[in-house]
Every structure is written in C-alpha cells, then in structure tokens.
C-alpha cells in the first residue's frame, strides 16, 4: 500500500496569501494518507513553537529511560500486555468520554499491564504529548509513544515527554527513514516498536535488520476491519527470519477477549497491544485482570 508523504500540490505562502496549484490527485486517497499529510504540517508548526535545541536541553535534564523491550521479555504475564490510553480514533470516533489519563494509567498498572501505550496524535486521536508527560509523572512502568512519526523532531518530542519507546510504522516510512529514525531513537535510549500490516512489510523490515521488536497490526489499512488471523498469516510467512533475528512479536488491534489473547499467543505473539476494548470498560483494572486471566 503506497502512502504519499505529502500532497502533490503543497500550499505555498507568499506574504499573507496561501495558495495551491490545482491537481487531480490533491486529496488524500485514504485515512492513513490524510493523517500523514496533516502530521507533516503539525511538525512544521511545532518546530517553530519549540525549536529542537530547547527540546534537547530538556532531555538532558531527564533521568534514563526504562528498557521497554526487556520489560516485555521479563513480563510475569504471558503474553505481555501493552495497555493503551486512547480517547478516540478516526474509525471509531470518541471511545471514552470520561477520559482521565492519570486515572486510566493507574488502573492499568493495578490491573497488571506490563507496559503502557499513549496516543500523542491530537487531530485524529485526541491525544497529545501533554497526556504522555502527565502519565509519566505518576507511572513507573515503561511507556510507548504511539504516533505517526515521520521526522526526527518527533522522536525528541517523545523523549522529552517521558517516553521509553516509540512506534515506527513501516507503511509510511522508506527503508532509509526507518534506519535513520531507528538510529536517532537508540541514541536517546528509546526502544523501537516497528509496526507492519502484511508479510511484504515484515519481510522488508527483517531484511533491514536491527529491529528486535515488531508489531503486526491486525487492522486492514484500506477497510479498517480487523482480523486476528493476520498475525498468524504474516508471522508464518516469515517464521524463519523471525527466529533467526530473535524478534519479539506484538499482536495489535482487534483483541477483545481472553480467547482472542490466547489465539494470537498461539500464533507466536509474545505480547499484545490492547486499546479500544479496554477503553470502553467502566472498571479498567478488573477488565484487564479478566483479560490476562
């Protein structure tokens, strides 16, 4: 699935005027492309509001990161659970009206979550780096910054906000981008979870090497429907390379029950990332305990 990083007719600003030359393919072709185009614009604005040197100065005052990958490996629950803090999504709209990130994080930790994932996209998921920073202040387990990372600047934003790991989505990044962003993240002490959606993407990431934590998203990027057997199909096609590189597999999306969790574990997932199914529960702690079993 090809994702264009920018519109074919980017807007040009001259003095107080902003315009774009008409183009027949000027609209995003899918929701992911729409998000990527908007993210590119957001990052440009963020750079002006808070220049990179100021972010770096903030990072230098922080304590060391927690080892996200090792924490998953050492989890007392099997598979390990990455519980997600997510208020809304493009496909589901508002997921949790009573959205109190701090309370949610505490409930997840009490429920037995191995790590947490925090959505930092504001436009489409109603998250933010402020949400991540607030959670970091009260939680001591590792945190994943979940966003649509396109630029190095965003990695510094994540680290400055208290992240221990970042998400890189293979579908929106070139090989060169993946390697470069990986290098920057590692230099900041961050773990990297690379997300793939099919066997072609997984093969591509495995050929690059150096990515010991990979997530298989069970959600179809075109229809946004979920199918848990995606984890099985994708992992099976690349089983030899996965074993050779000692990759820890994470199954993402579409996990609602204990049976779902056990199913993806049987497919080879050592960890699961669960968001919507938990976010819709009134009692998050008990819901997570029941899911873990």
From Swiss-Prot:
Documented EC number(s): 4.1.1.48
InterPro entries associated with the record: Aldolase_TIM (IPR013785), Indole-3-glycerol_P_synth (IPR045186), Indole-3-glycerol_P_synth_dom (IPR013798), Indole-3-GlycerolPSynthase_CS (IPR001468), RibuloseP-bd_barrel (IPR011060)
GO terms (BP aspect): L-tryptophan biosynthetic process
UniProt entry tagged with the keyword Membrane: no
Pathway the protein contributes to: Amino-acid biosynthesis; L-tryptophan biosynthesis; L-tryptophan from chorismate: step 4/5
Enzyme class, spelled out: lyase
Amino-acid biosynthesis recorded as keyword: yes
Enzymatic reactions: 1-(2-carboxyphenylamino)-1-deoxy-D-ribulose 5-phosphate + H(+) = (1S,2R)-1-C-(indol-3-yl)glycerol 3-phosphate + CO2 + H2O
Top-level taxon of origin: Bacteria
Record GO terms (molecular function): indole-3-glycerol-phosphate synthase activity; phosphoribosylanthranilate isomerase activity
Keywords: Amino-acid biosynthesis, Aromatic amino acid biosynthesis, Decarboxylase, Lyase, Tryptophan biosynthesis
Family, per entry: Belongs to the TrpC family.
Family matches, as NCBIfam families: PRK00278.1-4, PRK00278.2-4
Xref: HAMAP family: IGPS_B (MF_00134_B)
UniProt-recorded name of the protein: Indole-3-glycerol phosphate synthase
């Amino acid at each position: 699935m090809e994702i264009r990083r920018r519109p074919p007719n980017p807007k040009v600003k001259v003095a107080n005027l902003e315009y774009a030359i008409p183009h027949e393919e000027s609209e995003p072709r899918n929701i992911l492309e729409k998000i990527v185009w908007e993210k590119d614009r957001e990052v440009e604005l963020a750079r002006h509001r808070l220049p990179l040197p100021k972010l770096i100065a903030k990072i230098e005052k922080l304590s060391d990161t927690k080892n996200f990958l090792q924490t998953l490996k050492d989890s007392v629950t099997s598979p390990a659970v990455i519980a997600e803090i997510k208020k809304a999504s493009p496909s589901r709209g508002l997921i949790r009206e009573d959205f109190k990130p701090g309370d949610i994080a505490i409930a997840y930790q009490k429920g037995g979550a191995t790590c947490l994932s925090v959505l930092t996209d504001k436009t489409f998921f109603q998250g933010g780096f402020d949400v991540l920073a607030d959670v970091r202040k009260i939680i001591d387990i590792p945190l994943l910054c979940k966003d649509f990372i396109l630029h190095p600047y965003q990695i510094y934003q994540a680290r400055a906000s208290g992240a221990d790991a970042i998400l890189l989505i293979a579908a929106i990044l070139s090989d060169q981008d993946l390697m470069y962003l990986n290098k920057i993240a590692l230099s900041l002490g961050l773990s990297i979870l690379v997300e793939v959606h099919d066997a072609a993407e997984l093969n591509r990431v495995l050929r690059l090497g150096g990515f010991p934590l990979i997530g298989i998203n069970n959600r179809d990027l075109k229809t946004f429907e979920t199918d848990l057997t995606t984890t099985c199909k994708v992992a099976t096609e690349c089983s030899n390379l996965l074993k050779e590189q000692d990759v820890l597999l994470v199954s993402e999306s579409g996990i609602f029950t204990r049976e779902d969790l056990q199913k993806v574990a049987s497919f080879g997932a050592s960890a699961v990332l669960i968001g919507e199914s938990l976010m819709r529960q009134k009692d998050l702690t008990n819901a997570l305990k029941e899911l873990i079993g």
